[in-house]
Design a protein with these regions (language model features):
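A glycine- and charged-residue-rich anion-binding loop/surface
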Residues: 1-880
Length: 880
């Protein structure tokens, strides 16, 4: 059995099963597609579940993959042992109703003994205790000796997860020798020691379970196998754990070079090295698959891993961002199998670096506060951090609760997690209430039920509709009617009003009868599909059961439609200019503008903004038809339609297409041709959160209004400057700037002269204390700039000097303290001295040892404060 590297083993496995008629599929993304039960792909079978369940047709009945996987339930244990890791690759061969047990068993044995040349006497096999068929195949057809076979129970050798396909499994173990074992006479396969390593699991999916203990033999049986690539590499390379296999070890060596440490020399250092090595592998692949750091979902998992790795870097002396450098090695070691990493290298590095920088700012403050909390707890003999303290660290300072728990645990301290969770929930409740209050809605929740079919929405094709009032609510209570002047919520059986959703605001308009008018301010809808029209009765009354005419504000709707279509064009343009990592992170579409939040790691340059804007306007000028279709979700995905992460979609979805330039799932209202947008203009680009940017833009008449506003501003500026034309503004502003610069230079020179003149006077009455000249002076009318200039001169003096200079103007005053180098060597500290002097007046201040400033409290006490300087200075300076 010869040594073989990770990349070689991966390729040998996939090639072997290709030779057996399997289709090699590339690894699926770590982000589950269409599976809301998973945060991240955690097994080789997970992305193929749709084929096993008959929800989709596989490209072949035989498939082989090497799947990227992330598992994080034991994240705190990663590093503490060499067994645990969050990232791994799972080799697998799968059959969807094609071959079954004998083929799976035969090929597994052939791959191990013929391709990898593993010694047969080192291999042991387990089967489910009642699976005589598999036992006989292994012993009678493959020839495995019975003393190398073991029958295990349901817990070990029967794969089942609730109801659905299930079945027995067979596992292949490698015997690493008695020197790796526990030394017990009865040590055997299944023992918890390190001698027998489970390498490959073959699952024979042959039953359909109802989840209640009843099993039916399936007509079409499946094979699902899984073998950890890193674990296989451990066996083939003769090493003890994944951190010692070639590709992982090379990553760790990079970390060692940065930290200037060596693995296997110090236990604490080894823990840190394992944490960093594992986590940077996970995060590199996660970012490569489109995960962005955030405070929720998989984005939080990514952020937690990065911050945990950065923290352990600090524990081994790495103070500056460094993980982004290690990304290079992770990609280098995996590029042959995952070439997309090389293409995204610059992007991945940047995301990691930015997150490290952000964490560095957070962690310094958080560590100081947490250290203070832990010190106080020890002094008080307590071992639990209060929920309030943990919440303050998390909410106010952004210090993660899991990091608080981990650091506390290292000192034998726990966190009151229940109280912390309660405070988090209280905050969420307040936020929800604030939102409801701001919405001005009497509809606080969905507790009020409407006993009628859901509202039929006709607004995609009509702006007005004849309808019937099916419910009226006032202050959250159902009523029969509302009268003039009352605010209410009106529910109709059918409506042209678009209900707020997908970031698009709800429609406004009028609901009326010949005798009454209800002005609709906005529209939303309940989870069960009833449209809620919020507004006020302007005239007459609105009564349940009566027929009404519902008409939207058509002009407002048209403006909103322009901005919504613009948001789609904007996302497509951003992906073209910045890259495919751009995804919608939120949006607000109104009649006045569109606000689009998207994933990106840095501010856009002026040139990038210009390119994005030009692309959108180019598509507007091309007059591309905007087509909306309702399609089965599978067909929509085949078209490449972009979905919003976290949004729930049914079997039939609405797809909005702008030619082949933009294809998105969307339930909003849009123009039928891009030409109707007129013009597109970006107003601003800013940061919303780490890794999320925001663009605000306008279209159509909004652009014209913007241009008119610009022209008005320029005309006003020209008039103020007494210019005949706005064309002269730029030149005139440049001239003014030059004049201001010259005046600043003259003021600086004048301040220097004033400073020099005053300096000649203030030393006349200087006292000497312990060999240090102590100077105080009241210099009323002197600006803070001149005071600072004088202080700079004093601190640069060669002789030992302490000076406090004061200036009072009306009810305000300033103090400047300066200490020369020679005075500081004798114990003087400007920041501490000025604090003492200012305190006499009721003021506050401070600063560095050489210079400091303070504000005066009571100006009439400045003289008294200056008189106290001699005594204060004497407390600081000492005789030689």
């Amino acid at each position: 059995m010869k040594w073989q590297g990770v990349n070689e083993l991966r390729e040998k496995y996939l090639s072997f099963f290709e030779s057996k008629g399997h289709t090699r599929l590339p690894s699926f993304s770590l982000i589950p597609q269409g599976d809301k039960s998973l945060l991240l792909i955690n097994s080789g079978m997970a992305p193929l579940k749709k084929y096993f369940l008959g929800q989709a047709v596989p490209p072949n009945t035989r498939v082989t993959t090497c799947q990227k996987c992330i598992r994080t339930p034991d994240i705190e244990r990663v590093g503490q042992t060499a067994r645990h890791g969050t990232y791994f690759e799972m080799l697998g061969n799968f059959s969807f109703g094609d071959y079954f047990k004998i083929e799976a068993i035969t090929w597994a044995w052939e791959f191990f003994t013929k391709v990898l040349e593993m010694p047969a006497d080192k291999l042991y096999v387990s089967v489910f205790e009642n699976d005589d068929e598999a036992y006989d195949m292994w012993t009678k057809q493959i020839g495995v000796a019975e003393d190398h076979m073991v029958r295990l129970g349901r817990e070990d050798n029967f794969w089942e997860h609730g109801s659905g396909p299930c079945g027995p499994c067979s596992e292949i173990y490698f015997d690493r020798g008695p020197e790796k074992g526990c030394g017990k006479p009865d040590c055997h396969v299944g023992c918890d020691c390190d001698r027998y390593v489970e390498v490959w699991n073959l699952v024979f999916s042959q039953f359909d379970s109802d989840g209640n203990g009843h099993y039916t033999e399936m007509e079409h049986k499946n094979i699902d196998t899984g073998m950890g690539l890193e674990r296989l590499a451990c066996v083939m390379q003769g090493v003890d754990n994944l951190f010692e296999v070639d590709t992982v070890q090379n990553i760790m060596k990079h970390v060692c070079r940065i930290a200037g440490v060596t693995y296997n020399e110090d236990d604490k250092t080894d823990v840190a090295l394992r944490v960093i090595t594992d986590h940077i592998r996970s995060t590199t692949f996660m970012i490569g698959d489109g995960v962005m750091p955030s405070n929720a979902g998989r984005g939080y998992v990514l952020r937690r891993l990065l911050r945990r790795a950065a923290r352990y870097g600090r524990l081994i002396g790495i103070k500056k961002p460094f993980l982004y450098e290690v990304v290079e090695t992770v990609i280098h070691e995996n590029a042959s199998a995952y070439p997309e990493l090389e293409e995204k290298k610059a992007y991945i590095r940047k995301i990691v670096e930015e997150e490290e920088k952000t964490f560095a700012k957070t962690v310094d403050k958080g560590f100081d506060l947490l250290s203070g909390i832990l010190t106080l707890l020890k002094e008080a003999g307590k071992t639990v951090i209060s929920g309030e303290d943990a919440f303050k660290l998390s909410d106010t300072y952004g210090f993660p609760i899991d990091l608080t728990e981990e650091i506390a645990a290292e000192q034998g301290v726990s966190v009151d997690r229940d109280r912390f969770a309660a405070l988090v929930e209280e905050q969420r409740t307040r936020a929800r209430q604030d939102y409801q209050n701001k919405a001005g809605s009497s509809w606080a929740d969905n507790s009020v039920k409407i006993d009628a079919p859901k509202t039929v929405f006709t607004g995609y094709t009509s702006e007005a509709e004849e309808a019937k009032v099916i419910a009226v609510f006032r202050d959250g209570e159902a009523v029969d009617a509302v009268a003039e002047g009352e605010t209410a919520v009106v529910v109709l059986d059918r409506t042209p009003f678009y209900a707020e959703s997908g970031g698009q605001i709800g429609d406004s308009g009028v609901i009326a009868t010949p005798e009454s008018t209800f002005s609709v301010e906005t529209t939303s809808k309940t989870e069960d599909g009833h449209f809620l029209h919020f507004g006020m009765v302007e005239e007459g009354e609105i009564r349940v059961g009566e027929s009404v005419s519902a008409k939207i504000d058509a002009e407002k709707r048209r403006k909103t439609m322009r901005n919504h279509t613009a948001a789609h064009l904007l996302q497509a343009a951003l992906r073209t200019v910045l890259g495919d990592h751009v995804h919608q992170a939120g949006q607000l579409v109104t009649d006045t503008r569109c606000r689009f939040d998207f994933s990106h790691f840095s501010a856009l340059t002026a040139e990038e903004i210009k390119q994005v804007e030009a692309l959108v306007n180019e598509k507007i000028l091309e007059a591309i038809p905007v087509v909306t279709k309702e399609l089965p979700i599978a067909e929509a995905k085949k078209l490449g339609a972009m979905a919003l992460f976290g949004e729930k979609y049914g079997d039939i979805v609405r797809v909005v297409s702008v030619g082949d330039y933009s294809v998105e799932f969307c339930g909003g209202t849009h123009v039928d041709n891009t030409a109707k947008l007129g013009l597109f203009r970006i107003l601003s680009e800013s940061s919303v959160a780490s890794g999320v940017r925001r663009i605000e833009a306008v279209t159509g008449t909004g652009v014209l209004e913007l241009l008119a506003s610009y022209e008005e501003t320029m005309a006003s500026a020209a008039k103020a400057m007494k210019l005949s034309s706005t064309n002269d503004l730029a030149a005139h502003c440049a001239s003014l700037m030059a004049e201001c610069k010259e005046k600043d230079r003259q003021i600086e020179a004048l301040n220097q002269k004033i400073s020099d003149a005053k300096m000649a006077v203030i030393f006349d009455n200087a006292k000497e204390i312990a060999g240090v000249k102590v100077v105080s002076a009241m210099l009323n009318g002197t600006t803070p700039q001149v005071l600072r200039k004088m202080g700079d001169t004093i601190k640069d003096m060669k002789e030992p000097v302490i000076a406090v200079l004061a200036s009072v103007s009306g009810e305000k005053g300033n103090l400047v303290c300066a200490c020369s180098e020679a005075a500081r060597q004798k114990g003087a500290h400007a920041g501490k001295i000025v604090q003492r002097v200012a305190a006499i007046t009721g003021g506050k201040g401070g600063g560095k040892p050489d210079s400091a400033m303070a504000g005066v409290g009571k100006t009439y006490m400045v003289d008294e404060a200056l008189m106290a300087l001699d005594a204060i200075a004497a407390e600081f300076v000492k005789e030689d």
